[in-house]
């Protein structure tokens, strides 16, 4: 707060023993655990309305573009269901969606990123021409950007219930998968969210109780039919 930050962007990994690891020469060592994430993440953003002349411009919000992103996200949920993977979804607080898979923190970022890449390939084959993983913004036009590279040490996403620095002060909110088809992300603001979530059960409340074994999942992926 003393830095004037509006957004909260936590890492997907944590130190095992803060008192021991809170030293610059130890913090990045294997024993401290920062290279072993608790989550595999997928970042979905609709690049339906962008200007080719501005490579750095983020996509403008539109409900139609968001609905397209929801369709892709539900396709991703189908894959997770078929593979018996527990997954959690939230709005990004801006134009897209974030999907989290809780995993046992014994796998490196390199391993979790490779897993996310394989899942992204499966999703792309099921939705030809609708998804892109291109890094150059202008190459994403008209498609939903699926970013699996967020599974890298030091990469961050806005946290659950983080406010975003936009005009309406929208908030990244946790959802049930079945809620996706009805929600409008701009409805979730710093004015509406507190009362709304006082009256409902947090759909992410048990996320840390469902850490999954990636090796068991990979066995199912190897036999998976696209």
Residue positions per predicted region:
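C-terminal accessory nucleic-acid interaction domains of nucleic acid-metabolism proteins
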Residues: 2-40, 46-66, 70, 75, ...
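Short glycine-rich loop/turn motifs
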Residues: 37-39, 86, 96
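Active-site palm subdomain of RNA-directed nucleic acid polymerases
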Residues: 77-90
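Short beta-strand
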Residues: 87-93, 134-138
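Catalytic palm subdomain of template-directed nucleic-acid polymerases
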Residues: 100-112
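Short, conserved phosphate-binding/catalytic loop or strand-edge motifs used
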Residues: 92-101
